[in-house]
């Protein structure tokens, strides 16, 4: 089962924070105040790191003892482009594998992975739904502005 994480922008520190979503949510809306501790969940990161994960472009699995996974990324706007007009997508200028060898990724995966880091590093969090998924990665993220409403199923 994929780990579920809620991603919130903390404007006070200008960072993205990932918080584990408890298995009891089962796709129902979930919200908590930005300073609250996350509900308990099976640790994918060391226990002392789970209470406060402040990230700039790093997936949750960056803290895993197994090393980071790669994440595929798209926003609602890019999903339309990716699904409906794949021939219009540019070749990525550079690829970020984060644990995957170049031979194990397709050009579309490289393009999508590159999008998330550009958005996080250059423009910050958009106020729209973002979905992060990659086959083989045990992390699945749903991002929305605070309060975090987790409404999809893994």
UniProtKB/Swiss-Prot annotation:
Residues 68-117 are annotated as: Mitochondrial targeting sequence. A fraction may be phosphorylated in insect cells and HepG2 cells, a human hepatoblastoma cell line. Phosphorylated in vitro by host protein kinase C or mitogen-activated protein kinase. N-acetylated in insect cells. It comes from the Viruses. Pfam families: X (PF00739). It is found in: Host cytoplasm; Host nucleus; Host mitochondrion. The keyword Ribosomal protein does not apply. Signal peptide: none annotated. One of its GO terms (cellular component) is host cell mitochondrion. Multifunctional protein that plays a role in silencing host antiviral defenses and promoting viral transcription. Does not seem to be essential for HBV infection. May be directly involved in development of cirrhosis and liver cancer (hepatocellular carcinoma). Most of cytosolic activities involve modulation of cytosolic calcium. The effect on apoptosis is controversial depending on the cell types in which the studies have been conducted. May induce apoptosis by localizing in mitochondria and causing loss of mitochondrial membrane potential. This is Protein X. The gene is X.
